[in-house]
């Protein structure tokens, strides 16, 4: 029962997230020979105010 967690910054559309879940599921199923119904994809969307790189929040760029 594979679990895939993807973290990304806010701003993706619902259609983009739907496609991501579908395509990741396909790749994992193919490579691990796992049934699609056993593959879990968790999307963790982060606010730009809650993420920083090099000491600067993404919301401040």
Swiss-Prot record:
PANTHER family: 2-HYDROXYMUCONATE TAUTOMERASE, TAUTOMERASE-RELATED
Keywords from the named record: Isomerase
NCBIfam families for this protein: PRK02220.1, taut
Matches recorded under Pfam families: Tautomerase
Cystine connections: none
Protein name as catalogued: Probable tautomerase LMOf2365_2536
Active-site residues, as the UniProt record annotates them: 2 (proton acceptor)
Enzyme Commission (EC) number: 5.3.2.-
GO MF: isomerase activity
Membership in a protein family: Belongs to the 4-oxalocrotonate tautomerase family.
């Amino acid at each position: 029962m594979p679990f895939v967690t993807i973290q990304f910054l806010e701003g993706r559309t619902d259609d983009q997230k739907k496609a991501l879940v579908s395509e990741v599921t396909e790749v994992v199923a193919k490579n691990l020979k796992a049934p699609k119904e056993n593959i879990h994809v968790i999307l963790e969307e982060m606010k730009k105010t809650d993420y920083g790189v090099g000491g600067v929040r993404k919301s401040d760029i």
